[in-house]
């Protein structure tokens, strides 16, 4: 109090007073924090609308405002990054920052955008590389190029007449050797067609009392096995067109053949599979029994350790080199299993296809004895073959379209569907370079298709590509 008895007036602050300002209350701090961090708690898939007259401040980023503000002495060494960031923030239509040397009044106009925003923008991608907007709208971001699907020619590049090519689902009358020679059984004769020279050679004639039911090349491509309707298996020297030996065992026709080095497996209508070592004097070294109906499909794995067999009893069996009983049995198919193919890319991966009542391609892991997947193709599966160049396979089909389908594995997406045959496509073989397939049908034609790419490890021209186009006869 002063001398008059009045209270002293409160001190007034001056310009030179260095006393600190009063601290904000905790409630004010929480309010400011909520305002600053409001964007971080907004759902990326939810659009928030504000009042029709009051803009939504949550959509604004004031901390980034000076990105586009000209600054004296700013280093322009990171112009590329600045351009990319500006595009991500304000869009591709915003002009770049201008310096005072360029103009005295820098423009902050945002074309095609409202100054006030009345709703928050919804982020399009939860995996966006940009923290501000969808990558698709940022032209400065380089995306991985989308690989265009490989184009497969829809027409065969060559057609051969094949008179007397039988329309029998249980036979295997076409095979392609490692020496690029195609063997075809026509009636009671076997013909060889050299894919390099287009030369046709008549290998054998079984006579009027017999007919060819199967052909199969040895892995070296020098010898051809011929299964006959009388139950015999003949071995021919292809270069000399000379029969080396004839082996018995089957009581009925031999419709399936498969080689494993010097071991030849034959499957017949008598439900049996015979293992024959052509180096020995005996006609067969073992007999495999298990199927309850005709054996119509046989394939050795690429490591020659497992033999897969399919029969008209709707069964798929897997045998090893020493077993006389199947080590694996698969009974999921509901029709005859003729189409069998081992993957050259993954050990133990086996594909099989069922007949008219089944229509499915199934995949099996013989290492773990498991069923992997099933694809309903919509029609009879007549044959299967894997590409050795890419992880794809081809299936041939019967009624109603008689189509040839190229599949990607494991997605089983269709790469191409080829048509042209007027009968079911019963026969299928692949060229030694892995690029071309040949298909045969009861319409008595053989059609050649380029479906697979060349091997990446070598730059080779397809030996088949030099062949003349058009239609010729194989005999």
Swiss-Prot record:
Extent of motif C-box: 51-57
Record note on what altering residue 454 to E does: Mimicking phosphorylation and leading to reduced activity
Pfam families for this protein: WD40_CDC20-Fz
Family matches, as SUPFAM superfamilies: WD40 repeat-like
Mutation effect (residue 45 to E): Mimicking phosphorylation and leading to reduced activity. Strongly reduced activity
Motif (CSM motif): 80-91
Protein name as catalogued: B-type cell cycle switch protein ccs52A
Organism: Medicago truncatula (Barrel medic)
Gene from which this protein is expressed: CCS52A
């Amino acid at each position: 109090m002063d001398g008059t008895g009045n209270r002293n007036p409160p001190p007034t602050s001056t310009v030179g007073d260095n006393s600190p300002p009063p601290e904000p209350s905790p409630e004010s701090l929480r309010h400011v924090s909520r305002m600053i961090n409001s964007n971080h708690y907004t759902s990326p898939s939810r659009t928030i609308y504000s009042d029709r007259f009051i803009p939504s401040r949550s959509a604004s980023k004031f901390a980034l405002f000076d990105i586009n503000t000209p600054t004296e002495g700013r280093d322009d060494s990171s112009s590329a990054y600045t351009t990319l960031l500006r595009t991500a923030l304000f869009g591709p239509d915003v002009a770049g920052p201008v310096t005072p040397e360029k103009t005295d009044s820098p423009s902050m106009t945002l074309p095609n955008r409202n100054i006030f925003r009345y709703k928050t923008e919804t982020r399009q991608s939860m995996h966006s590389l940009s923290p501000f907007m969808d990558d698709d709208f940022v032209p400065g971001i380089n995306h991985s190029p989308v690989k265009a699907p490989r184009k497969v020619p829809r027409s065969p590049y060559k057609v051969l007449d094949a008179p007397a090519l039988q329309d029998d689902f249980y036979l295997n009358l076409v095979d392609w050797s490692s020496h690029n020679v195609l063997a075809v059984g026509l009636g009671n004769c076997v013909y060889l067609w050299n894919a390099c020279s287009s030369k046709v050679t008549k290998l054998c004639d079984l006579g009027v009392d017999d007919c060819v039911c199967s052909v199969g090349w040895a892995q070296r491509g020098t010898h051809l096995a011929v299964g006959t309707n009388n139950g015999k298996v003949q071995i021919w020297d292809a270069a000399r067109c000379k029969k080396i030996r004839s082996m018995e065992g089957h009581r009925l026709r031999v419709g399936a053949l498969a080689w494993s080095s010097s071991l030849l497996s034959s499957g017949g209508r008598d439900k049996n599979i015979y293992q024959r070592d052509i180096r020995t004097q005996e006609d067969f070294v073992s007999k495999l029994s298990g199927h309850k109906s005709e054996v119509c499909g046989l394939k050795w794995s690429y490591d020659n350790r497992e033999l897969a067999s399919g029969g008209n009893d709707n069964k798929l069996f897997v045998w090893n080199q020493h077993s006389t009983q199947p080590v694996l049995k698969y009974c999921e198919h509901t029709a005859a299993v003729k189409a069998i193919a081992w993957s050259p890319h993954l050990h133990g991966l086996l594909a099989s296809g069922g007949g008219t009542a089944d229509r499915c391609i199934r995949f099996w892991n013989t290492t773990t004895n498991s069923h992997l997947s099933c694809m309903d193709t919509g029609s009879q599966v007549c044959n299967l073959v894997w590409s050795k160049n890419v992880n794809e396979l081809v299936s041939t089909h019967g009624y109603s379209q008689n189509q040839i389908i190229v599949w990607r594995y494991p997605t089983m997406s269709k790469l191409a569907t080829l048509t042209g045959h007027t009968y079911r496509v019963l026969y299928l073989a692949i060229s030694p370079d892995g690029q071309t397939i040949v298909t045969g049908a009861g319409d008595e034609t053989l059609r050649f298709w380029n479906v697979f790419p060349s091997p990446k490890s070598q730059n080779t021209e397809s030996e088949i590509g030099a062949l003349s186009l058009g239609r010729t006869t194989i005999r």
